[in-house]
């Protein structure tokens, strides 16, 4: 009887964690949370119980990369400053990119996001009907206003034409920041934070929702970023902490004890 009650309790906890994550978490993350709660259970056991409950993590999808053409002058500015760099603090490296968001009635929208590479936190974003340099700068200015980074910050991005524009590069310079690009013929891991973020947004959130208009898309994305991704979504690379909790842990270790 005790074993039956114990298993029932674990099954309930697995379901609670699963539904609290909106069906996003699989056995690795659920196991990590259970262990943090003091429940000693293996990932294999959690996986088996999830099969018993007939639940599973939302599966990933493949999103093709955009291709862009560059002039010889533009190719000359392509330098990757974060390759082999030890990224060990917030506001050391930001990454940014654009991804496509499809709606039923308002067509294709464009989401520009800035991520703190250290914590994977979304620090500035903008949803637009266009993908102009001015749209990029709206998201950039939001991130700067929120984070107030010191000079020397590295802004790393893909090779899209907006990021290669003189206006954008000059804006980076005016803030006393450095710009960095993924290399020509690069592998996707050179902008891995953005690739991972876009995949998470689309497979975990947008794939289960219908977006009819711009307003629907904006509200849905804001709900994911502010309500789940930043404060709650745990990452294995962050020691199974959320981006906000990872930053809190970093700053708590830097604060001298009284």
Residue locations for each model-derived region?
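Active-site beta-loop-alpha junctions of metal-dependent nucleic acid enzymes
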Residues: 107, 126-148
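An active-site-proximal beta-strand-loop segment
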Residues: 87-123, 129-131
């Amino acid at each position: 009887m005790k074993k039956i009650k114990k298993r029932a309790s674990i099954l309930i906890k697995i379901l609670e964690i699963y539904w609290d994550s909106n069906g996003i978490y699989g056995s690795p993350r659920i196991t990590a949370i259970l262990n943090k709660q003091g429940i000693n259970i293996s990932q294999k056991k959690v996986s088996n119980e999830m099969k018993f409950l007939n639940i599973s993590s939302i599966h990933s999808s493949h999103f093709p990369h955009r291709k862009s053409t560059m002039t010889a002058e533009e190719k000359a500015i392509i330098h990757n400053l974060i390759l082999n760099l030890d990224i060990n603090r917030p506001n050391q490296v930001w990454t940014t990119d654009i991804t496509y968001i499809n709606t039923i009635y308002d067509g294709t929208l464009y989401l520009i996001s800035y991520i703190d590479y250290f914590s994977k936190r979304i620090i500035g974003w903008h949803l637009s009907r266009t993908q102009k340099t001015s749209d990029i700068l709206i998201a950039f200015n939001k991130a700067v206003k929120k984070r107030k980074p010191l000079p020397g910050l590295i802004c790393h991005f893909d090779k899209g034409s907006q990021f290669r524009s003189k206006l954008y590069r000059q804006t980076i310079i005016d803030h006393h920041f450095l710009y960095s690009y993924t290399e020509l013929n690069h592998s996707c891991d050179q902008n891995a934070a953005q690739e991972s973020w876009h995949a998470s947004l689309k497979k975990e959130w947008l794939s289960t929702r219908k977006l009819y208009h711009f307003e629907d898309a904006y509200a849905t994305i804001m709900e994911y970023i502010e309500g789940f991704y930043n404060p709650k979504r745990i990452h294995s690379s962050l020691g199974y902490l959320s981006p906000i909790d990872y930053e809190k842990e970093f700053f708590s270790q830097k604060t001298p004890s009284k």
